């Protein structure tokens, strides 16, 4: 019997312990799951501002002549739609149309693209790129190059203003700035559905920026927030989480991510399979479920129309905003389920009535 591998640690573990964080494993990393409590942190983010350390996210750099053109030939979305100083949600797919990972591509210039991926999938993304990279380009796994600090919520702009960081940035844009001599990439991105920013300081200098952010967030009546709140926030928005709503077995079309595919491009990994699936229609589709009564839904529950199984829940939580249980579920297309329809979820042998809704469950405020 071999011992389990030791969990990786981010650059701010000591700071989180000082703040009283509870920790859990995420993608092989030991990360803060909560401080004051998930519901409190969720509400602070929706109503004021939350500060999240997501430094476990992967980073990779593609550099060399024609880097943007190469990345555009591999990842699904069309980099030709954006320009330097902009970021784009995209996917890295297998040739069979499954998802290796979903990620954000930062367009630095034609010869440099910076990628942020899910923690556990960084090596797989790098491997997929390396397998088809032409001579003259380098792909570097930079997992520990930068911390990632997400400042999310209606008062996020006030927080960045307190630090003298730029705020007049278009959604999905970014600016390279500095704080107290520390370079910081300020990105108008997030995973909560709120207006927000993601800051990328160097790994070794992250504490300088984090300490200042904590003080400014508290002054703005916000809270440090853990990955527990990040999950409830993204579930309310219907945002996919890799391993739940996206995987090698769950295609972008099934997860309603077809908008992140450049269908008119000549090439990207999985193109033929995804075009065929688009023509035929996906065999299942991501739906939202809202409980009619009290309780909480969890992943892996069977969804039924009457007594007939028609799908499975992929994520589920109690929505602090709506004060009701919500879930995301993959529902068979042949079941012809409609928004507003009542269906049943089997919760440990108990038939729980839910309404089918189209995510998001609450209003998007990212812009």
From Swiss-Prot:
Keywords: Aminotransferase, Transferase
InterPro entries according to UniProt: GCS_T, GCS_T_bac, GCST_C, GCV_T_N, GcvT/YgfZ/DmdA, GcvT/YgfZ_C, TrmE/GcvT_dom1
The reaction(s) this protein catalyses: N(6)-[(R)-S(8)-aminomethyldihydrolipoyl]-L-lysyl-[protein] + (6S)-5,6,7,8-tetrahydrofolate = N(6)-[(R)-dihydrolipoyl]-L-lysyl-[protein] + (6R)-5,10-methylene-5,6,7,8-tetrahydrofolate + NH4(+)
Entry EC number(s): 2.1.2.10
Listed GO CC annotations: cytosol; glycine cleavage complex
GO MF, any single term: aminomethyltransferase activity
EC top class named in words: transferase
One GO term (biological process): glycine decarboxylation via glycine cleavage system
Entry superkingdom: Bacteria
Alphabetical list of NCBIfam families matching this protein: gcvT, PRK00389.1
Matching HAMAP family: GcvT (MF_00259)
Function text: The glycine cleavage system catalyzes the degradation of glycine.
Record's subunit section: The glycine cleavage system is composed of four proteins: P, T, L and H.
Family to which the UniProt record says this protein belongs: Belongs to the GcvT family.
Protein name: Aminomethyltransferase
Species this protein is from: Mycobacterium leprae (strain TN)
